[in-house]
């Protein structure tokens, strides 16, 4: 079964958690976009929800599918955030940020009563780190920050991190996030202690946020061959 089909199964299963009257955090990325299309169909059938988008792209896809949006600063409560992930381990720790939306995704996830993560089975890992860890940094002094990120990762137990500035598709200009920052992609191979990496990176002034999501996801829905497997903490 293709990854697309598995993502669709996971997104469809996530709809079971949605009820009328909810304000939803709307994640970013390919699986989140599938969810938005399915959510739009439910809204046409009478489901009454509104969403807080975590990226300009998500806002665009939501609007195209008839999902009502509300400004994040006009929200009192976010019931559920529904998002994808680049990696998920057995403790529901995540790596996110392949789509460069990690800061806003984390803000919304932290503000939500529940975070649901939808993935295809290829995203399940025993140990985080095969997927490069994105670190969002201020553009001012980013080269200095990159050096500090490298040293922090080594102190946190990453043997040979490779820290690279993410660039646009042309490979020339640096990619700029919706918030106006740069992304450092940190190839780690394995992250034995996500908490240590979290603490080390947060101590660097130039680091805005990083793609480790710890103690946030409480439901992981995995699209597998012919079905969706729901795991809850």
From Swiss-Prot:
Gene3D superfamilies: 3.30.70.260, 3.40.50.1360. InterPro entries: NagB/RpiA_transferase-like (IPR037171), Ribose-5P_isomerase (IPR050262), Ribose5P_isomerase_typA_subgr (IPR020672), Ribose5P_isomerase_type_A (IPR004788). Substrate binds at residues 28-31, 83-86, 96-99, 123. Belongs to the ribose 5-phosphate isomerase family. It catalyses: aldehydo-D-ribose 5-phosphate = D-ribulose 5-phosphate. The active site is at 105 (proton acceptor). This is Ribose-5-phosphate isomerase A. GO terms for molecular function: ribose-5-phosphate isomerase activity. The keyword Repressor does not apply. Its EC number is 5.3.1.6. The keyword Transmembrane helix does not apply. Pfam families: Rib_5-P_isom_A. Pathway: Carbohydrate degradation; pentose phosphate pathway; D-ribose 5-phosphate from D-ribulose 5-phosphate (non-oxidative stage): step 1/1. Catalyzes the reversible conversion of ribose-5-phosphate to ribulose 5-phosphate. Keywords: Isomerase. Homodimer. GO terms for biological process: pentose-phosphate shunt, non-oxidative branch. It comes from the Bacteria.
């Amino acid at each position: 079964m293709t990854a697309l089909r598995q993502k669709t199964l996971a997104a469809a299963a996530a709809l079971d958690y949605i009820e009328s009257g909810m304000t939803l955090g709307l994640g970013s990325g390919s699986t989140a976009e599938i969810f938005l299309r399915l959510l739009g169909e439910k809204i046409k059938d009478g489901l009454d929800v509104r969403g807080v988008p975590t990226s300009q792209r998500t806002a665009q896809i939501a609007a195209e599918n008839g999902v009502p949006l509300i400004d994040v600063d006009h929200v009192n409560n976010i019931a559920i955030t529904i998002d994808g992930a680049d990696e998920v381990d057995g403790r529901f720790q995540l790596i996110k940020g392949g789509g460069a939306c990690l800061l806003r995704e984390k803000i919304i996830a932290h503000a939500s009563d529940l975070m649901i993560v939808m993935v295809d089975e290829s995203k399940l890992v025993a140990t985080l780190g095969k997927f490069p860890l994105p670190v969002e940094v201020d553009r001012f002094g980013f080269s200095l920050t990159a050096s500090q990120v490298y040293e922090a990762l080594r102190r946190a137990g990453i043997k040979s991190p490779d820290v690279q500035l993410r660039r646009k598709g042309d490979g020339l200009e640096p990619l700029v996030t919706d918030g106006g920052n740069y992304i450092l992609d940190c190839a780690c191979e394995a992250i034995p202690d996500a908490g240590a990496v979290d603490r080390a990176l947060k101590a660097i002034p130039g680091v805005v946020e990083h793609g480790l999501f710890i103690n946030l996801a409480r439901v992981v829905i995995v699209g597998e061959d012919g079905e969706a497997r729901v795991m809850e903490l």
